[in-house]
Amino acid sequence: MIITKLHIGHLIQDELRSQGRSVAWFARELGIDRTSCYRIFGAPSIDTLLLIRISLLLKVNFFTFYIDILQNKLD
């Protein structure tokens, strides 16, 4: 089963913008370069440990998006 409706990179980028944070800040806090940030924003899926780090950094549980989709598929 593939979850096609969720593009986690776009959700992360949208949240970063809504918090008024820059890509430079995001890169610095994650210890990565800006190019890697744009790769994250463009990616429809993401490594679990990286998503945990991003969730803690932005104080948003991005896993809830997956849980909602999974629950709808299970119902």
Regions from the language model: what does each represent?
Residues 33, 44, 69-73:
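The DNA-recognition helices of helix-turn-helix-type DNA-binding domains
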Residues 1-25:
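A short, Lys/Arg-rich alpha-helix, primarily the initiator
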Residues 20-38:
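Short alpha-helical DNA-recognition segment
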Residues 59-75:
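Short C-terminal boundary/hinge segments that cap the last helix of small helical domains
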Residues 43-56:
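Short, basic-rich loop-to-helix N-cap that marks the start of a DNA-contacting helix
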Residues 16-18, 42-45:
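Short amphipathic helical patch at the helix-1/turn junction of helix-turn-helix
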Residues 38-39, 66:
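Key DNA-contacting residues within the recognition helix of helix-turn-helix
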